[in-house]
Amino acid sequence: MAKYLSLEEEVAVRLYTSGYYSGLNRALRGEIAITEEYKVYKELLNNALNKLPKTSSSTFYRLEKWSPESLKKEYITGKTVEKKAFTSSTYDYMAAEEMMFDDASYNVLIKIIGKNGKNIEEASLLPAEKEVLFKSNTKFLVGEIKPIPSPVNPNENIMFINLIEK
């Protein structure tokens, strides 16, 4: 990453994967107050992502946890959603499935067809996640939404959502 990013930017990417993402993304979604530190960090991380090359893949996977009611409000087929927070994903379906085995409370599998995700695994503290990160305020068109058998327990369903980056 050193050939693309300054040391400060590479450290910002690494910090994101350390768990810093949790408070940052909550603040960007409006769940907690956004501090000046988060505002500066958001700009630094977005600038770093702008400098990284696009990934060779265009299909990514993401896991989320939603109540059925909240899911129906957030994701409506044919509508555009703007993700105020950074959107983490993986280019490796098996990595997503493994995360689901580690935490069976994930009840939504999202397949993202994207063009601007940036592979950050080289700077990540968790390279096994094979993380691809989308900038804050990325917009996605909601495609198909349907129940599918859970990879963890095939007798139970999870929701599958297809998102297409705009």
Predicted regions and their residues:
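Mono-ADP-ribosyltransferase
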Residues: 1-166
